[in-house]
C-alpha cells in the first residue's frame, strides 16, 4: 500500500511473502527481478578437477558436457571461461560465455555479452571452468567482510543487490539493470565508512524506487544479527527472485473518485487551483468536482467529453452533437471549463502514440 503499511506489517520479515516485493501494487511489478550475490564464492569460482569438460567442444558449439552435475556449481546467468589446457588455470583467451540452461552434465551457452553464438575457440577435453556472477560488472568486486564488521570481530557480512527489469515492461528493454547496491551488510547495526546505515533491508527500503525487502534468504540463518562476533552464514550461490502476482485494480467508481477528490474540500488546509476531471469523465463525477469548486470558490474544474463521443467518430457534426449532448447533462457553473477535443500525440521518450 505505502511505506507506513510496509513498516507496520513487513519491515521485520513478518509477512512471509518471499524475499522481495514490488514497491507498489499493480501488474508492473511482475517485470521485476531481484538478484543477490551474498558471498565471494557466489561472486566467482574456478571449478575443481572433478568438474571439468567431459570431452572437447568444437568452434560454434552451444552446448558443452561436463564431468559432474553442473547444477551443483554453475548457475543460469553465470559468465564463464574455459582454460586453454586440460586441468589448467590458464584462462587466457578472454572469451566469455553466459550460461542459459543447465541439465545435469550439459551446459548451454551463448557468447557474452553478445547474447548469441557458440564457442569462438575450441575447448579442450578436461578444460576447467571459471565462473563469475552475471552482474559482477555492476558492483565493486566480490562481497566479503566490511570494515564495520571487522572491527567488531564479525565476518562475511557483505552482500550485493541488483534490481533488474527482467521482462522490459519498466524500461522498455528486457534485462535492463534498474538499480545496483554494492557491499551492503547483513548486520542489523551496520554502518558505512561515511556513517550511514548499511543494513541491506533498510537501505533497500529507504533508497530503492522499485522494491521492498521482505525477508532474508532462508539459508542465511543468522542474517540480521548484530555484527559483533558474528560469522554470517555463507550462501555460496547467487540468488534471484522474479516477482509475480501483481494485479492492476479495477476501474474506480464515481463513488470512489468522489471520496478521493473530497480531500480537496477544505480550502484552509489544501491548496489547489486547477482540478482535472481525468479519464473517468462521467457526468456524475464532473458534477461532484463542480460542487467542490463552488464550495471553495478559489479553483476551477477542467472536464472533457467521453472519449467515445469524439475519438473514431469520422463525422465532425456527429462529434459536435455528442459533445453538446454530454455537457447538456452537466449543470451550468462559473467554476468549470469544458473542452471538446482529444489530442493524438507522440511520446518520444517511450516511442508510443
Task: Give the role of each language-model region.
Residues 1-48, 75-100, 110-353:
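A glycine- and small-residue-enriched flexible loop/hinge signal that marks low-structured segments
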Residues 47-57:
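Disulfide-bonded cysteine-rich modules in secreted/extracellular proteins
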Residues 57-59, 101-104:
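Generic beta-strand structural signal
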Amino acid at each position: 500500500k505505502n511505506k507506513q503499511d510496509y513498516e507496520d506489517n513487513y519491515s521485520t520479515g513478518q509477512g512471509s511473502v518471499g524475499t522481495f516485493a514490488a514497491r507498489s501494487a499493480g501488474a508492473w511489478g511482475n517485470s521485476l527481478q531481484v538478484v543477490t550475490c551474498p558471498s565471494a564464492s557466489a561472486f566467482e569460482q574456478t571449478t575443481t578437477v572433478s568438474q571439468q569438460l567431459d570431452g572437447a567442444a568444437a568452434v560454434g558449439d552451444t552446448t558443452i558436457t561436463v564431468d559432474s552435475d553442473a547444477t551443483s556449481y554453475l548457475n543460469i546467468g553465470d559468465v564463464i571461461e574455459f582454460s586453454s589446457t586440460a586441468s589448467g588455470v590458464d584462462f587466457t583467451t578472454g572469451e566469455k560465455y553466459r550460461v542459459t540452461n543447465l541439465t545435469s552434465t550439459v551446459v548451454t551457452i551463448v557468447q557474452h555479452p553478445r547474447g548469441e553464438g557458440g564457442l569462438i575457440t575450441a575447448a579442450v577435453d578436461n578444460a576447467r571452468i571459471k565462473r563469475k556472477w552475471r552482474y559482477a560488472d555492476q558492483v565493486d568486486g566480490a562481497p566479503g567482510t566490511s570494515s564495520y564488521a571487522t572491527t567488531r570481530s564479525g565476518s562475511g557480512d557483505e552482500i550485493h543487490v541488483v534490481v533488474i527489469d527482467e521482462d522490459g515492461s519498466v524500461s522498455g528493454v528486457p534485462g535492463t539493470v534498474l538499480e545496483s547496491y554494492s557491499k551492503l551488510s547483513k548486520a542489523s547495526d551496520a554502518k558505512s565508512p561515511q556513517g550511514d546505515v548499511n543494513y541491506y533491508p533498510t537501505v533497500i527500503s529507504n533508497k530503492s524506487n522499485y522494491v521492498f525487502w521482505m525477508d532474508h534468504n532462508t539459508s542465511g540463518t543468522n542474517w540480521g544479527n548484530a555484527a559483533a562476533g558474528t560469522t554470517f552464514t555463507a550462501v555460496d550461490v547467487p540468488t534471484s527472485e522474479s516477482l509475480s502476482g501483481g494485479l492492476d485494480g479495477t476501474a474506480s467508481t464515481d463513488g470512489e473518485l468522489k471520496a478521493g477528490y473530497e480531500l480537496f474540500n477544505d480550502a484552509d488546509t489544501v491548496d489547489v487551483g486547477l482540478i482535472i476531471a481525468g479519464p473517468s469523465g462521467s457526468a456524475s463525477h464532473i458534477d461532484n468536482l463542480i460542487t467542490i469548486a463552488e464550495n471553495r470558490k478559489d479553483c476551477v474544474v477542467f472536464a472533457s467529453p467521453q472519449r467515445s463521443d469524439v475519438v473514431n467518430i469520422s463525422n465532425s457534426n456527429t462529434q459536435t452533437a455528442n459533445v453538446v449532448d454530454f455537457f447538456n447533462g452537466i449543470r451550468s457553473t462559473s467554476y468549470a471549463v469544458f473542452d471538446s477535443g482529444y489530442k493524438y500525440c507522440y511520446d518520444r521518450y517511450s516511442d508510443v502514440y
